[in-house]
């Protein structure tokens, strides 16, 4: 089956991470110094007719090679019609998505890199199953904080992001940070930036975290429990 190396999909309900991963790839593979090297097709459909037009624009973009040759990137950005909603279930939408999937299965031009990003995807649909066989698919879902052990997963994410921006945590400050902020990656990134500016190069300790980080509802519960444990109430 042709074209598997130039089809990339980023799915999941963690919108910030989905968008960032797709953006990073587009910046990596898009031709440099070529304003026509990246074509973005907005995937936000208002209704089924709009979804059909979006798919048509995507197909046209894939099939239209650069006038002067070379490579191009087509990014179907933030598609909202792969989900189990009214627009996604419409017959016209399903036919359009089927035509797009058929095109991908037939193989897209090797000069084209296709990126698809979507936060809501019905994993029961044929599209999802077939795109997983066709291309490189990454999924970014929000961590379920109702399940035991969620803190470890979020701590791994924070540790990786902190390293990227040069932020270090001292002792149990990382754990406190996660327990106070929660699992929303957008909020985590924002709070890490604030904390990094505050500590200005030194390792962040628990007091820094408590002083600077905004407390989420989840964090408020933790703070109350922590205060009770320390008999501070």
Task: Annotate the PLM regions.
Residues 1-233:
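Conserved beta/loop motifs at nucleotide-recognition and modification sites
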């Amino acid at each position: 089956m042709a074209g598997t190396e130039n089809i990339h999909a980023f799915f999941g309900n963690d919108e910030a991470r989905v968008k960032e991963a797709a953006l990073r790839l587009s910046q990596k593979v898009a031709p440099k110094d070529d304003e026509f090297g990246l074509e973005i097709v907005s995937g936000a459909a208002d209704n089924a007719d709009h979804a059909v037009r979006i798919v048509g624009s995507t197909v046209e973009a894939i099939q239209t090679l650069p006038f002067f040759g070379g490579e191009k990137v087509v990014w179907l950005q933030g598609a909202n019609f792969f989900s189990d909603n009214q627009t996604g279930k419409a017959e016209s939408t399903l036919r359009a998505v089927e035509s797009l999937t058929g095109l991908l299965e037939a193989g897209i031009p090797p000069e084209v890199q296709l990126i698809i990003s979507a936060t809501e995807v019905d994993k029961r649909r044929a599209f999802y199953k077939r795109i997983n066989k066709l291309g490189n698919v990454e999924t970014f879902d929000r961590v379920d904080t109702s399940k035991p052990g969620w803190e470890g997963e979020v701590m791994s994410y924070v540790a990786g992001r902190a390293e990227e921006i040069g932020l270090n945590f001292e002792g149990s400050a990382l754990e406190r940070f996660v327990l106070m902020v929660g699992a929303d990656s957008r909020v985590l990134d924002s709070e890490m930036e604030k904390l990094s500016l505050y500590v200005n190069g030194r390792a962040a300790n628990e007091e820094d975290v408590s002083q600077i980080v905004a407390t989420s509802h989840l964090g408020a519960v933790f703070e109350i429990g922590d205060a009770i444990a320390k008999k501070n109430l």
